[in-house]
Design a protein with these regions (language model features):
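Blade-edge motifs of beta-propeller repeat domains
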Residues: 32-35, 77-90, 135-139, 226
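Beta-loop motif signature
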Residues: 194-249, 253-259
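Beta-propeller domains
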Residues: 68-73
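Bacterial N-terminal signal peptides that target proteins for export
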Residues: 2-15
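Sec-dependent signal peptide cleavage junction
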Residues: 19-35
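Short aromatic loop motif centered on NTY/YTY
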Residues: 92-123, 130-207
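Structural core positions within WD40/WD-like beta-propeller blades
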Residues: 54-58, 108
Length: 260
């Protein structure tokens, strides 16, 4: 996949998402295992792994410019996590609770800054010995959120905004292994164009079907081998997304042929 023509797809993944707007994600959740956690309101849910409901409370303090200067998470009235947010320009925090099993309960914290930029995003697990939350993810500034949780699987919806395609989102599955969330596969066929959801012109109708029109002649590859060439003004269909060494590639179909 070295010579993919969509050069802007070949960006370092965390960097590409560091300066992007927060995705207009759907609020549809797996109701049985994923919950939104309101700030400054107690959520009763098991986070310690004993099967009993714990008290989870998230609070924030503001500076004179209405930015959050400190985030605090309490579990059963004891401080389990603090974050100094001074100079991070965070306006608000969103939080989600996810239960995979009685031993794997997770808490996602996302800090939102100016223009809905994602400033902070991590997933945490509770340590019963230290009574503290510790990170099990490497999300950093990426735009993603937990959407469902099962016994052995956590699903996150991710997003990016390549210049050639506009907003895309997709889902990735993770397993909890050695106290870390690990991708089960680096390739997904769930990738979708979402920019067509906000307009009603002829191109938007195509985007809603994952169809794009080439602005110039493009070459598509399978590995280092040229798969096919598409003339200007032709339609190609987005089929898959894959991640390799912090690089994102997109697979398109032209007729019966596919290439990256």
């Amino acid at each position: 996949m070295k010579n993919a023509i969509f050069k802007l797809f070949k960006v370092t993944f965390p960097f590409a998402l560091a300066f992007m707007m927060c995705l207009p994600f759907s609020m549809t959740l797996n109701a049985a295992s994923v919950k939104n956690i309101p700030v400054k309101k107690i959520l009763s849910a098991d986070i310690t792994g004993d099967g009993k409901a714990d008290k989870i409370l998230i609070t924030t303090s503001m500076d004179k410019d209405c930015f959050i200067k400190k985030l605090k998470v309490k579990v059963n009235n004891k401080v389990a996590f603090t974050k100094n947010c001074t100079n991070n320009n965070i306006h608000s925090f969103t939080a989600r609770y996810a239960k995979m099993s009685n031993k794997n309960e997770l808490l996602q914290l996302m800090g939102i800054g100016d223009n809905d930029y994602i400033v902070f995003n991590q997933i945490y697990k509770y340590n019963n010995k230290s009574k503290k939350l510790y990170s099990v993810s490497k999300l950093d500034y990426t735009a993603c959120e937990i959407v469902s949780a099962k016994k052995n699987l956590l699903t996150l919806r991710h997003g990016d905004q390549p210049a050639e395609t506009g907003w895309l989102n997709w889902k990735m599955n993770y397993k909890f292994r050695n106290n870390k969330l690990v991708l089960t596969s680096t390739t997904t066929s769930t990738v979708k164009s979402i920019i067509g959801n906000y307009h009603n012109d002829s191109y938007s109708k195509l985007f809603r079907k994952n169809i794009f029109v080439t602005e110039k002649k493009l070459r598509f590859y399978n590995g280092s081998k040229l798969a096919f060439t598409v003339p200007k003004g032709k339609q190609v269909t987005l089929k898959k997304l894959t991640l390799s060494k912090n690089t994102m590639y997109l697979q398109f179909q032209y007729g019966k042929k596919t290439g990256w």
